[in-house]
Structures are given as C-alpha cells and as structure tokens.
Amino acid sequence: MTFVKKTRYLLAPPYCKTIETFISPIPNSPTETSGGLRLAGGWRCFKNLRVIQKKKNSLIEVLMPTQELLRVAKNYSKDSLNKTEFQIENLVNKRFPFAKLDMSKPHIMGVINITPDSFYKNSQVKNLKRLTKIFYEMVNNGASIIDIGGESSRPGAEKISVVEEKQRVVRPIEQLKNCKINSLISLDSRNLSTMKVCHKVGVDIFNDITAFKEKNKINFITKTFSPIIIMHMQKEPINMQINPKYNFAPIDIYKFFSKKI
C-alpha cells in the first residue's frame, strides 16, 4: 500500500512523460449552482481539482484551481496543455443517456435481494406479495432503477447454482414487469445463463460483479444492445476480503474501469 503525501507543489507539469497524473473535481457547495465548470453537464459545479501524481512508488496530492493547472500545463508544453484540457473536458462533457435515463440529474437505485443471506437484511424478500409491496414503495420514493439479485455477493458469501438463482429471480421479475411502471429493472447476476433467461422476460439492465470478464457475456450484451453496470472486486465474494492488495485504491480502481470501458 502506497501512502499519499499532501503538498503544495506538483512533482512535474501535468501529463509529462515521466509522471502519471490523475485529476478529480472538488464540487462546490450544493447551494452554489453557478461559478466554475459544470460537472458532467449536470447540477454540480467545480472550480478546484484534486491532482494526484505518481512517480514509481511515490504519490503526491495537490489541491489547486482548475485554471491554475491549465496555466502550469500551458507554460510547460503544447502536449501537456492538450492532455490536461482533454481530461478536464472528460469531467465537463454531458453524459449520454443510460438506458434512456437522463444522466444530467441524479437517479436512485432500489435494491431487492431475493436471498436468505443478504448483507443488508432489510433488503431481503421472501415472497411475491412482499416483493410487490417493496417494489411500489421504492418506485413511489423516486427510484429510477430497481436492482434484483438472487445470489448474495457480500464478503464471505458462497456461490449458489445457476438453477437456484433462476428459481429465485425469474418469476419475481416476470411479476414486476407486469406492474406497468416507468422504473427500469436491473438484474444483479454474474451468470450468462440467468442473464439470457431474464432478458427474455424483459430485464432492462444487467449488473455484473465480475465486470463481464468472460467473452461470451460481452457477445451477449453486444448482440442484445443491453445497458450494463460494471462492478469491481478482487477475487470472489467468498474470499474478496482476505488480504486484498491495492497500491492506492482510487488509482487502481480508476485504471481497472478505464481498461474495462
């Protein structure tokens, strides 16, 4: 594990060849609806950045105004400025709709676990009557997506059979799709066979804790044009908390998702 040294000065100009540079926005107060740049074309603005630079095993963090970072890059080289502007544009650009949802505003996902061993007991559902009741409560409270899972992925959870997972989720999803509401239904599953069956009964989104690492899953979602949610974990749920190894988790996970996307 690498520790981050907080300092007032960069190791080097941003995005030069010998140093890795990463930036993240520091949002203004929620009541500050103007001033600075708009994050992802949405409702929050930012003027300042958290800049992290990595050289071998050394990490430093600098908090600085966006315009100051651009000034440093411009004074160094055209390449540094272009790369800095590109990364800031990635923060600012409006996001495309996801599963027809407008991503310029926040969305709530409700989670229903049709499992006996869920991490959060209040999300467990054991019969269809209670399932429908909870479903409508979530929708009425503003949930844009309802995520249905039949296999627990809590730390230490053991894998169940695909047959058992299907028995838990297919009929409930069929019932919920008949409710005629606007909220989308997401399937939380790592099994292609379950995904295929649930696609036939109308699931809108697939959410995979293994990040669709198998090629046959990628082929399936490409063929069906299905929206997906990619998750991150090390190893399997049963052993994911046994000595996980990160150099610096924010950067490690950022690189994981960058590669996946």
Range-by-range predicted roles:
Residues 103, 158-187, 193, 223-233:
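Alpha-helix-loop-beta-strand connector modules within alpha/beta enzyme cores
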Residues 112-113, 185-193, 209-212:
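Glycine-rich beta-to-alpha transition loops that act as phosphate-gripper elements at the mouths
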Residues 1-99:
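N-terminal accessory interaction module
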Residues 108, 114-119, 153-156, 201, ...:
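Conserved anion-binding
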Residues 112, 138, 142, 146, ...:
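Conserved, mostly hydrophobic/aromatic
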Residues 116-120, 144-172:
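Glycine-rich, proline-tolerant flexible connector loops at the mouths of alpha/beta enzymes
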